[in-house]
Amino acid sequence: KLKEQEMLVSQKNAELLALHSQINPHFLFNALESIRMHSLLKKENETADMVEKLAIMQRQYVEWGNDAVTVAKECEFVKAYLALQKYRFGERLNYNIDIEADCMECQVPKLTLVTFVENACVHGIESKSSPGWIFVRIGRQEEGLEIEIEDTGSGMAEAKLTELQNNMCNASIEMLKGGGRVGIINACVRLKMVTENRVEFRVEGEEGVGTTVTIRIPCLQEGKTDAESIVSR
């Protein structure tokens, strides 16, 4: 019971920090919409599209009424993020998202999937001069979900792969204070919290070839506890 209370307090503290970062979000959304409409009037369709994608992303960041979202909703955010990054990297970034239909209504903590995609983009594609790919795959595996984020970027040495996997498996609130890959650690902590530590992390890859992160979690359904929400094939 004490451990559960500590986890709830930690989660509430994280949500409070998110609330502190909301500097009049409605003003921001209205401003973005004004810029988008102005761009459309000037027939600057590409700029309008970029602003629209940015608004989608920003709305997810500031709306913390519920930490859980469906896989379908999280994938909308992933698509918006990758589409925006495509404007930045051009032909250097290609991506493919493959989600099995029976996974769409399962729930994941908000912004977890996109955190791993962002990591693949920044640490994989950004440091590579030649074109690369990011693959996002989600499918059913036994009694849960298997989430796979693969990039054909710069990759990592074996020691770094092992270090990253260990950090993900041992992710804790305390680790968030130490800097480093804070986004990844934050995502791992929340995945551990909502699944009651019933999550598996695996990191594979090769330097100069790419990296694959695999996450296995129960298939959580809205309004149910972890034990009740596991859905078999």
Name the predicted role of every residue range:
Residues 1-202, 212:
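Two-component histidine phosphotransfer core
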